């Protein structure tokens, strides 16, 4: 008899244990977008929700419904309601309820997608305790964006927000009138100037460096290129300033030598006594040369007058020209002007009466 009793007891315990295992289940409980895995012996949705510390209000969204039986691996979603104090374009606020977690979701849920939050961002979380949510309605404005004019009808709290909503946000050093923080009003005209700094790399010639070789037998104001050298190539990076897509300036900021240049050789005169003073009134002398000799400083027509300002040989020699060259046409422009200045000091501009007057010399 004892053996029969023990056997029956073991059978009952085994059945009870199997039932407990079968009744235990793991489900996913998602509350306001946050998911958690919970283990429970409860069977109804509402019991599992309350078991985990959440109450359900009439305004809340619960799926599946409260009385639905739950099975292992099921998912329960609870979206709790929260109050919003909605005001449109500054008018009196009214209270509405939403189960949305963000401002953007709330506007969609309330069928107010044609409005925009006046202060909060669309991604702002709506706290369970609720919040004040001033919104603005869509306005029609004229937008001149870097010369492209169009009319847009969008909801935005300010100029910067409207540009973002239009898909053309302010970037870098862009300038906008009215100011970016100015509130949007119906019929507003917005002018945007797009200022950009971009980097551009171009392959350019690399001028050769010049090696200067002194020649004591040649006048100081003269240079002779013995070897012009060979230009190389370089990649030059420029910082390019643009206004509304039009380049307004550039500065080189870096360069990389691709092909080195072969240096040039320049012979420079260092002959003593051939110093040339700085040219004064160069434009007047060029004008006189243009009148006297067609601007040709090396002219020699055989008429007894030489060079740009048409020295005769006696005047050239008397005013120190031989220190530079036997005749004026064999001297450089600067050397001829040096002798011409000596002549002017002695004879005045009257040495070139017609052409000096035409040049405006006094």
Swiss-Prot record:
Ways its activity is controlled: Activity on the artificial substrate MUF tri-NAG is inhibited by 2-nitrophenylthiocyanates (NPT) compounds. The synergistic effects on peptidoglycan degradation of RipA plus RpfB are inhibited by addition of PBP1A (ponA1).
Q: Name one GO molecular function term.
A: hydrolase activity
Q: Which UniProt keywords apply?
A: Cell membrane, Disulfide bond, Hydrolase, Lipoprotein, Membrane, Palmitate, Signal, Virulence
Q: Which CDD domains match?
A: RPF
Q: Which GO terms describe its biological process?
A: dormancy exit of symbiont in host; negative regulation of gene expression; positive regulation of gene expression; quorum sensing; regulation of cell population proliferation
User: Which positions carry the signal peptide feature in this UniProt record?
Assistant: 1-23
- List the EC numbers from the record: 3.-.-.-
According to Swiss-Prot or TrEMBL, what is its membrane topology?
Answer: Lipid-anchor
Q: What intrachain disulfides are recorded?
A: 291-355
One cellular component term from this protein's GO annotations in UniProt: plasma membrane
Q: What is its induction behaviour? A: Expressed in actively growing cells.
Q: Where is the lipid attached (S-diacylglycerol cysteine)?
A: 24
**Use case:** A promising vaccine candidate, an rpfB-encoding DNA vaccine induces elevated cellular immune responses, confers modest but significant protection against intra-tracheal tuberculosis challenge in female C57BL/6 and BALB/c mice.
Which residue(s) hold a covalent lipid per the annotation (N-palmitoyl cysteine)?
24
> What is the annotated localization of this protein?
Cell membrane
Instruction: Write down the superkingdom of origin.
Output: Bacteria
Q: Please describe what happens when the gene is knocked out.
A: Not essential, disruption of rpfB alone has no effect on growth or survival in liquid culture, nor in mouse infection models, colonies plated over a 52-week culture period are visibly drier and more friable. Alterations in gene expression are seen. All 5 genes in this family can be deleted without affecting growth in culture, however triple deletion mutants (rpfA-rpfC-rpfB or rpfA-rpfC-rpfD) are not able to resuscitate spontaneously in the presence or absence of O(2), and are attenuated in a mouse infection model.
Q: Which Pfam families match?
A: DUF348, G5, Transglycosylas
What's said on domains? An expressed fragment (residues 194-362) hydrolyzes an artificial lysozyme substrate 4-methylumbelliferyl-beta-D-N,N',N''-triacetylchitotrioside (MUF tri-NAG).
Q: What else is known?
A: Was identified as a high-confidence drug target.
Q: What does this protein do?
A: Factor that stimulates resuscitation of dormant cells. Has peptidoglycan (PG) hydrolytic activity. Active in the pM concentration range. Has little to no effect on actively-growing cells. PG fragments could either directly activate the resuscitation pathway of dormant bacteria or serve as a substrate for endogenous Rpf, resulting in low molecular weight products with resuscitation activity. Reduces lag phase and enhances the growth of quiescent (1 month-old culture) M.tuberculosis; works best between 8 and 128 pM. Increases the number of bacteria that can be recovered from a 3 month-old culture. Stimulates growth of stationary phase M.bovis (a slowly-growing Mycobacterium) as well as M.smegmatis cells (a fast grower). Binds N,N',N''-triacetylchitotriose (tri-NAG). A fragment (residues 194-362) hydrolyzes an artificial lysozyme substrate 4-methylumbelliferyl-beta-D-N,N',N''-triacetylchitotrioside (MUF tri-NAG).
Assembly and interactions? Monomer. Interacts with RipA.
Family, similarity comment? Belongs to the transglycosylase family. Rpf subfamily.
What is the protein's given name? Resuscitation-promoting factor RpfB
Q: Provide the organism lineage as a comma list.
A: Bacteria, Bacillati, Actinomycetota, Actinomycetes, Mycobacteriales
